[in-house]
């Protein structure tokens, strides 16, 4: 008997405009349909665009499932099937917060629905905002506690500006979703963390905060969103540390297409597949600028994987 279906994440919000917002969530199954119900009595429905971030893997350094020590389950990198679902809600009213709920249908027609949350499009100018500026979570010990305190202090958070280094190794799926130490990226920002800290003989479990279910997140690429040469048989840690410039890869391997050059040099594919990024006619750029209320947010792509001791 198959285990019951469940969501891999709660829904989260991205890139609101004055009349729209994107709702995103993840599962470990492709499914037969995924949708967002929203509005009065949840009577309106939008179906999703679905993709599989194909570089997500686990390896001997993962802490996921029953693997609590190095190499207990995974001796080398193993691909993990994870699906991203994105619905674009349009024709929203500025300043009006409405209810929404996500649903997914499995291949056997089993239906699962999430909790009901609220969303709204981008705030109008002149409205006071509470914006969380954060960075460098990287499954660090204090993240869940800090985010729990944020939510206890500010009942309403309007947006999250994330200045890079969201996880430690971007192609390691469990760092985003379900590290068994309880402090993966999404659980901490969605109030589902279970990170235990011990102080003065007392154990306390910190759960992070329910933040990005109702406040859009605007991410930025840091050096920990960049992976190196792909699928080399090395550990994910070694791949992360194996970046080389594209022109060097071209000289070494003679690769002509962008995809093959990325495999032989560096890439930000997992970051770009996990988050919605604004696009122009040539596709995603990794950098962007948006207006959010009275704030003009400019996000650069200036991370440097190659460090020098004199800079």
What function would you assign to each model-found segment?
Residues 2-311:
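Metal-dependent phosphoester/phosphodiester hydrolase catalytic core
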């Amino acid at each position: 008997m198959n285990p019951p279906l469940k969501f891999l994440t709660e829904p989260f919000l991205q890139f609101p405009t004055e009349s729209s917002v994107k709702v995103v969530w993840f599962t470990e199954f492709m499914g037969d349909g995924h949708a967002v119900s929203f509005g009065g009595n949840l009577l309106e429905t939008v179906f999703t665009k679905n993709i599989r971030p194909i570089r997500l893997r686990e390896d001997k350094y993962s802490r996921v499932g029953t693997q609590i020590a190095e190499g207990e389950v995974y001796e080398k990198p193993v691909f993990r099937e994870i699906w991203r679902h994105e619905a674009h809600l349009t024709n929203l009213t500025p300043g009006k917060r409405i209810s929404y709920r996500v649903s997914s249908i499995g291949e056997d027609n089993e239906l699962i629905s999430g909790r009901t949350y609220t969303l709204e499009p981008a705030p109008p100018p002149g409205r006071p905002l509470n914006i969380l500026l954060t960075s460098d979570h990287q499954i660090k010990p204090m993240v869940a506690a800090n985010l729990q305190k944020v939510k206890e202090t500010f009942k309403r958070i309007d947006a999250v500006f994330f200045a890079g280094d969201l996880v430690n190794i971007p192609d390691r799926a469990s760092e985003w979703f379900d590290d068994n130490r309880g402090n993966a990226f999404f659980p901490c920002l969605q109030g589902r963390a279970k990170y235990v800290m011990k102080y003065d003989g007392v154990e306390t479990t910190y759960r992070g905060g329910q933040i990005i279910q109702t406040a859009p997140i605007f991410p930025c690429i840091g050096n920990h969103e960049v992976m190196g040469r792909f699928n080399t048989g090395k550990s994910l840690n070694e791949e992360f540390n194996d970046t080389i410039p594209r022109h060097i890869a071209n000289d070494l391997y003679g690769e002509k297409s962008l995809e093959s050059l990325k495999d032989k040099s560096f890439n930000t594919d997992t970051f770009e597949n996990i988050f919605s990024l604004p696009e122009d006619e040539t596709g995603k750029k990794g950098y962007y600028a948006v207006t959010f209320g009275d704030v003009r947010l400019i996000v650069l792509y200036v991370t440097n994987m190659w460090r020098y001791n004199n800079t």
